[in-house]
Design a protein with these regions (language model features):
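Extended, subdomain-level signal for the structured scaffold at the beginning of enzyme domains
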Residues: 1-103, 107, 115-127, 135-220
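Catalytic nucleophile serine of serine hydrolases
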Residues: 111
Length: 220
C-alpha cells in the first residue's frame, strides 16, 4: 500500500480524454490538499482534446500495471469519447473500477465515462447522468438515466459535460474530504460516503476475466 494512501485520488484516462474534465477536477483536488495520480495504460503522457481538437498532453504518474486500488480513496473518470471507448475495453481499468466500487469509495464519472461503468457491470439499479447519447446504453444496462448537472447515488457521482464541472467538483470534494477524514481517523475503508448503497460485491456483475487487455483509442 502506498505511503499516505488516505489522501490520494486516482484518475484513470488515456489518449482522447476531454481536457477540462481531467484538469479541472485534478486542480480542485490538489487545491484541497489531496494527492492525485494520473493512471494510464501506458507510461509517458496522454493526449487531451478540447472537443474534436488536440490540446495539451498530461504526464502519466503510474501505469495500470503499477497502480493498486488499495492505494486510493477515490476514483475520477474523465470523459472524451475516444478515451472512454478505449478504457471500457481495458480489463485492468475495469478491474480497478470494480475494486474501488466494491470498497464503497467515491467514483466521480463525467460525460462519456459512464460507458466504463456500463462495461464494468456496475450500472444496474443505479441512477446517473452522462453525455445524452449514452442514455440508451445506461438504460439497457439496467440503470436509470436523468438529465441533471450532477447526480449522486451512494458513492457514485456523475455529470453530463464540461459545463457541469463546478457542480461535479463540488460533490467530488464533499465526498472525498469525507473519505479522507474517515481514513485519517483509522476508519478504513471509510464505507459509502453517502450511505445506504450495497457493496458492488453484493450485486450481480458480469466480471471480465482478469488480465491486461488493451485497446488503442481509434483515430478521429
Amino acid at each position: 500500500m502506498a505511503e499516505n494512501a488516505d489522501d490520494r485520488v486516482a484518475v484513470i484516462a488515456t489518449d482522447g480524454f476531454e481536457e477540462a474534465e481531467l484538469t479541472e477536477p485534478v486542480k480542485a483536488l490538489r487545491d484541497a490538499g489531496l494527492k492525485v495520480d494520473i493512471i494510464a495504460p501506458h507510461s509517458g503522457s496522454i493526449q487531451g482534446f478540447k472537443h474534436h481538437d488536440k490540446s495539451k498532453t498530461i504526464p502519466v504518474d503510474r501505469t495500470l500495471d503499477q497502480a493498486d486500488p488499495e492505494d486510493y480513496i477515490a476514483l475520477v473518470l474523465p470523459g472524451g469519447a475516444l478515451n472512454a471507448d478505449a478504457m471500457r475495453m481495458n480489463d485492468q481499468a475495469q478491474d480497478f473500477i470494480r475494486a474501488m466500487d466494491g470498497a464503497h469509495k467515491p467514483l466521480a464519472i463525467i460525460c462519456h465515462a459512464p460507458w466504463e461503468l456500463v462495461s464494468a457491470g456496475l450500472a444496474r439499479g443505479r441512477t446517473m447522468t452522462s453525455w445524452p447519447t449514452l442514455q440508451d446504453d445506461i438504460r439497457n444496462a439496467g440503470g436509470q438515466w436523468v438529465d441533471r448537472e450532477v447526480v449522486v447515488d451512494g458513492n457514485l457521482i456523475t455529470s453530463r459535460k464540461p459545463d457541469d464541472l463546478p457542480a461535479f467538483n463540488r460533490e467530488l470534494l464533499a465526498r472525498v474530504t469525507h473519505q479522507h477524514a474517515s481514513a485519517a481517523a483509522g476508519d478504513w475503508p471509510a464505507g459509502d460516503a453517502a450511505g445506504g448503497r450495497a457493496a458492488a460485491s453484493d450485486r450481480p456483475q458480469n466480471r471480465r476475466r482478469e488480465g491486461a487487455g488493451k485497446q488503442k483509442a481509434p483515430t478521429a
